[in-house]
A protein has these predicted regions:
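A structural signal for multi-pass alpha-helical bundles of membrane permease subunits
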Residues: 4-294
Length: 294
């Protein structure tokens, strides 16, 4: 009997064992390796020479490039997440209403998110090209401009376009996360509010927002992780150039590892990014959960 009880108690863990093994191999072990590499002296060939403590972190933090890259990463993440959340929420409210061709509009909205980021970035890079771009060609044909306009005269302008592309491909994700929350709201809440004389804005802030808060929390946390670690858009459009002026942590550590052969420093940057990401996501989750409890 005791053996049967023991087996019954172990059964759930046996079912979970394959998942635990996969997580260990593909998630936990790589994280351990990155932490180990960040504290090791690594040759350009990728061979670990020995333990070096926090030397790699010191080299990274002392460099002026890292400060610029960190600032770019924070601007990139905050701008894309905040703006895409606002526009995604508004778009979800629109798509939640019944109107003609709603299904077709929803299919069009999801398209930027469903398409490869490399393709999206490549298309936008072509659109804003000064000499052959579709934007200049269109504006010249309709007579709004007489000669091609340089849409990216500075690194800051390039970075602004990258943020725009990031928002463009992220809005659909937020839209459908919020839309799923909106569709789960019982219409009786709105009917009762209408009877009580509530206007649209009162319904929005007293009923809609509180009831979709969980959907917004999930989409925001996933967006922070997704945008913070985004590589294809910036790499396809500028590769972080000129002089790392448009680099984020992900593209910067890629250059350190594969262009300069500094795997130890690249791992240190990766660890710093990982810790920042964990901190930001944890703070947001704690604040959101406390508000829900209140």
């Amino acid at each position: 009997m005791k053996k049967k009880k023991t087996l019954a108690a172990l059964e759930p863990y046996l079912w979970l064992l394959p998942s635990i093994l996969l997580m260990t191999i593909f998630i936990l072990f790589p994280i351990f390796e990155v932490f180990r590499t960040s504290m090791s002296e690594v040759s350009k060939a990728g061979l670990v020479k020995g333990f070096c403590g926090f030397d790699n972190f010191a080299k990274v933090l002392r460099g002026s490039t890292f400060k610029l890259v960190l600032k770019n990463t924070l601007v990139w993440t905050i701008a894309v997440v905040v703006i895409s959340t606002v526009f995604g929420f508004i778009l979800a409210l629109v798509l939640n209403n019944k109107f003609r061709f709603r299904k077709a509009v929803r299919a069009i909205v999801v398209f930027p998110w469903a398409t490869s980021l490399i393709i999206q970035a490549g298309v936008w890079k072509f659109i804003i090209d000064k000499d052959y771009g579709a934007l200049n060609t269109l504006l010249m044909k309709i007579g709004l401009i007489s000669s091609p306009v340089n849409w990216t005269p500075t690194p800051q302008a390039y970075f602004a376009w990258e943020i725009f592309v990031g928002i463009f491909v992220t809005v659909p994700f937020v839209t459908f996360c919020v839309l799923s929350g909106l569709q789960s709201i019982d219409n009786s809440y709105y009917e009762a509010a209408t009877v009580d004389g509530a206007n649209y804005w009162q319904k929005l802030f007293k009923i809609t927002l509180p009831l979709v808060k969980s959907s917004l929390t999930v989409s925001t946390v996933l967006n922070i992780i997704y945008v913070f670690n985004s590589f294809p858009i910036i790499w396809t459009i500028t590769k972080g150039d000129p002089a790392s002026r448009t680099d984020t942590l992900v593209t910067y550590l890629y250059k350190l590892a594969f262009y300069k052969g500094k795997s130890g420093e690249a791992a240190a940057v990766s660890v710093i990014g990982f810790l920042i990401l964990c901190l930001c996501a944890s703070i947001y989750m704690v604040v959101s959960l406390r508000k829900e409890e209140e």
